[in-house]
Amino acid sequence: LDTYKTFDEVLESVDQQFEYWTNQMCSSLNIIEEAHREIKPLPYVSAFFEDCMESGKDLTEGGAKYNGTGPQASGMATCADELSTIKQLVFDEKKVTGAELLQAVRDNWEGHEKLYALVNSSKVHHYGNDDDYADELFKYMFECYCRHISGRENTRGGHFSPGVSSVNANVAMGLNTNASVDGRKKGEAISDNMGPVH
């Protein structure tokens, strides 16, 4: 965060991260699907699918008519609020440097109470409040995610389709995540599904 000269560089980095991590995720999911097919086929469940009965193939072999894989993005509103905070406070208003913001996060906001209060206040743009400033950043991230996932093939002859749903995993994910630029402290839940945090 302290090496970027422009916010466009930040957005480019976000896109690169989405590309890298969606590659990792899709590869991992394909390995898991191959393992299911080889180690744990589902003949009993497959018997309830007319398509599987007609094709003579197990669900894990692509016996069903629809064979999509739908990985779900989690914490998107948290990320949108992070980008909004960076854009507003570091680049647009220059109220804090990237290095200072990064240090506050590394310190879990301890010793940075004024900045913590500002980031969590209505003075900073937040996603989901009919605020185009932050909502456009959510849109950008979701478009990155969709672009890097949509149309990829899975092991069953289907395709990956992006979604945004954390169910209740956002709590566990937050427990294992350090503090974030949006004013979330270490261990606090990340955003739920597509819902706003602030």
Show the residue positions of the predicted features.
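Acidic, glycine-enriched catalytic cores built around paired aspartates
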Residues: 1-198
